[in-house]
């Protein structure tokens, strides 16, 4: 029996060439509502989980994107990017802003895809309705250009593409399983390496930090629901429509 991933892959790419299939997959995954409530139990099951739940965070969404892109014989790796949830461009309500300021460093997941001699960032994190709250939604991706990063990396605003053919060999080191990336980004050939790296980073969090993260996740998801309903939360009891 075909898996949920196989069914959606066929639905999203039927009668399309490789380029149009790639863009279609990206747009469908981007449009899946972002949510922190769907746990990442296993990188291998995450693609199915996000389709079944109909929502998901950056991890499941990009595991799904990578799996589908690889079905098109595209070269894809994972990009883990360190960031802070306390992004000044996001129109947080005051209480959520206070929570975000207390959180430890977080780790975003996106993909890098090979286009000629370049490895471009492909980030399908935020669904379009979230743009009104300041989220950098990638509305119109052409399948060739670098997308906007969903978060602000801690050391650089944007990861520059690897676009110098003379540097490909030195920047793409198979032994190290990484590209020449800024301090805030770590690249991974596969899900296992990414999961190992991620757990190494988050396992140092204190019980207090974990409780703050859980509280933030609940309130963040509730706020996103209001944003999608065109209710931008400004202050207790005050919504802008």
Which stretches of residues belong to each language-model region?
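Secondary-structure boundary elements
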Residues: 1-56
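Generic structural hydrophobic/aromatic packing signal, biased to beta-strands
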Residues: 25, 29, 69, 76-78, ...
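His-Asp-centered catalytic microenvironments across diverse enzyme cores
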Residues: 17, 34, 83-241
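Active-site neighborhood of thiol-dependent amide/isopeptide-bond enzymes
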Residues: 40-102
